């Protein structure tokens, strides 16, 4: 898996996604939980989403509408990624490599989510009627300008 390439900020996204999965008792970490993880990490991807009108409450409400609550209790140490989430993380690494980065930050993850048109996260973002192209442009501009600072966060 690509976790060794995650910056501290990307690790926060994953931890927060796991907490959201536990909140919904889904028993897995899906792209919808990753989206919530990005919204709970205090970085640039978070700010772009919030400025676009995507909030934790809106996303949680849509997850509840689409998937409801499950009945699976998973301990904090277990990380059960569904296949689509694994693919998003692999795609995040590919995005990072496109920019000659040897690390993954939340912005790479968000770009991968925005390209996965069959994911629940993409469906949620689309249903919130935001400017997907504008979000992508903001993220790409940020990545191009901030690669050195994020590389220092790699642990």
Where do the language-model regions lie?
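Histone-fold recognition with a strong bias for associated Lys/Arg-rich disordered tails
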Residues: 1-155
């Amino acid at each position: 898996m690509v976790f060794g390439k995650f910056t501290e900020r990307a690790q926060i996204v994953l931890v927060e996604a796991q907490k959201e999965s536990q909140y919904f008792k889904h028993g897995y970490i899906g792209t919808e939980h990753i989206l919530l993880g990005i919204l709970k990490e205090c970085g640039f991807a978070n700010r772009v989403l919030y400025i676009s009108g995507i909030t934790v409450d809106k996303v949680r409400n849509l997850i509840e509408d689409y998937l409801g609550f499950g009945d699976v209790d998973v301990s904090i140490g277990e990380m059960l990624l569904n296949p689509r989430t694994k693919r998003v993380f692999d795609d995040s690494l590919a995005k990072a490599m496109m920019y000659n980065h040897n690390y993954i930050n939340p912005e790479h993850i968000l770009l991968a989510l925005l390209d996965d048109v069959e994911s629940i996260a993409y469906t949620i973002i689309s249903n919130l009627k935001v400017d997907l192209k504008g979000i992508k442009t903001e993220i790409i501009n940020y990545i191009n300008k901030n690669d050195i600072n994020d590389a220092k966060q790699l642990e």
